[in-house]
């Protein structure tokens, strides 16, 4: 309880909600072009239909949105070479800004933001973008492995669901967060602290996904308040929720590691 209280207090001191809003906004902007780009890249290996189906399956496990909406995003953005080129450009900019905001936010929590040189910022951005691409590739292998295990158990649907819809997303999310919490701070971070923070954030995101998806199914989403913009509101709200949880996990790592520079009132956040 004491650690949790300290995390919440420091999260407020570090203007965590404002940073989460920035990260969430750029995350929201990067989701559609990421889906289109992943489908386009997958089309070089398998058929476009197979690639789009795989991308929708993967995204739906992290995003509480209707499959029809996700499918429409992909179908509306593929087929035109010019559109794909623009999409890739938008993805490069928006994804870069997601990681830029995340890097700044986490280093604010460590009181190290003033020690980030321009070169290190660019290196961290490139590293995180490469790691994200690596996790996407890893998801293909894990998906195939999960299918093979399910078939070994006689094609059990329950085992297939457990592996593909639960264990694989959790493993990918946990691995990505451990790497983020370990590599981003401008100081040495213990892997044990990073793992604890990543585990807490992963559980928080999965629990929030369940609650948010249940709310959308039970109450029809944001249709009453936002009308035709309900889908946009859902994606933006979810991006904000995820960003808050990720930054709370980062704050937990800083509290556990006990290497954060004390607040001397010299920074503005």
Where do the PLM segments sit?
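Membrane-embedded alpha-helices and immediately adjacent juxtamembrane helical segments
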Residues: 1-269
């Amino acid at each position: 309880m004491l650690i949790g209280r300290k995390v919440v207090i420091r999260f407020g001191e570090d203007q965590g909600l404002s940073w989460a809003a920035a990260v969430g906004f750029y995350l929201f902007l990067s989701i559609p072009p990421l889906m289109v780009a992943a489908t386009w890249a997958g089309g070089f290996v398998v058929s476009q239909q197979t690639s789009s189906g795989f991308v929708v399956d993967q995204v739906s496990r992290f995003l509480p949105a209707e499959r029809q909406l996700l499918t429409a995003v992909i179908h509306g953005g593929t087929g035109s070479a010019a559109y794909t080129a623009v999409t890739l450009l938008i993805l490069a900019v928006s994804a870069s800004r997601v990681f830029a905001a995340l890097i700044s936010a986490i280093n604010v929590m460590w009181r190290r933001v003033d020690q980030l040189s321009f070169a290190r910022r660019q290196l961290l951005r490139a590293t995180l973008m490469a790691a994200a691409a690596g996790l996407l590739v890893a998801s293909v292998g894990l998906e195939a492995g999960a299918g093979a295990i399910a078939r070994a158990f006689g094609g059990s649907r329950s085992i297939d669901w457990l592996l593909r819809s639960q264990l694989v997303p959790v493993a990918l999310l946990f691995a990505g967060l451990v790497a983020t919490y370990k590599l981003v701070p401008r100081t040495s971070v213990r892997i044990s602290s990073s793992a604890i923070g990543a585990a807490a954030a992963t559980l928080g995101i999965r629990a929030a996904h369940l609650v948010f998806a249940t709310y959308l199914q039970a109450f029809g989403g944001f249709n009453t308040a936002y009308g035709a913009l309900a889908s946009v509101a859902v994606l933006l709200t979810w991006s904000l929720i995820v960003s808050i949880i990720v930054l709370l996990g980062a704050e937990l790592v800083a509290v556990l590691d006990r290497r954060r520079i004390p607040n001397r009132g010299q920074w503005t956040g």
